[in-house]
Amino acid sequence: LEGSPKLGGAAYLSALINEVREKEDTVFLFDSGDMFTGMLANLTEGEALMEMMMTMEYDALGIGNHEFDYGIEPFKRGIHRVSFPVLGANIFYKDTDQLFSRAYTILERDGVRLGVIGIIGLDARSVILPSYVEDLDFRDPIPYVRKGVEELKPLVDVIVVLTHQGKTGPMQTDAEHRPEVQRDFDEDIKLAGAVEGIDVIVSGHAHRGIEVPYIHPKTGTLIVQTYGYGTRLGYLKLFFDGEKITRHEGRLLKVWSDKLKPDPLVEKKISYYKDKVDHIIGE
């Protein structure tokens, strides 16, 4: 509606990220998948979004179902060209134990060492066009997260899991009493309870939005998730006493496009790809 506040946009999201970086000493930036969405992604087979992520200096991407919207090969090309790790601990080439991409990575900044694992859930796998991923196996993520945690624990201070799982569904529906159509993060709660040693789960796919970090009652794992579509920036600050997390602060920051000044570098990239797409459409 005219006059209503405006939310979202990559250049405005980047501006908000830069504001956080200016205020905080040590910042890591993650995405839990489905970056390959929207017209620019569709007409460039994800290239435009990968370029913008590099400009915004992401530290890691967990694989989502939309990363396979153009098949395996375009995504593989994207993985090889980006400067950040793309993670999928439970995606294998069919009938082998060869990973499609990296299972995890170790990031170090200002003396803080993070182990970051990425997984995609079987619900998310089910919405990928089968012919596009017929050469891949998507396996139960829990054993592979457990394996990653066991390998990373002696090497890092914090373990983060980027998840793309759970059910998506309309936020309001005539059948909203039915659990299968609700957006929720039950799969993340299940994972947090099944694997000891996960400090943070950065969740995607369901776009449920968790306004304040959920704390697992058994393991203490923090679970965070935005509403997706670049309308919020998830902010989580961890406080340490030695190597132990003692407390945290977390919330969703709204990306007000009528209040933020767009990041000129990202804006320039968007303009370049819009011109490129207009040329493609005009042919």
Where are the regions that the model predicts?
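Acidic, metal/ion-coordinating pockets
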Residues: 1-265
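Active-site nucleophile-His-acid catalytic modules used for acyl/amide transfer and hydrolysis
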Residues: 266-283
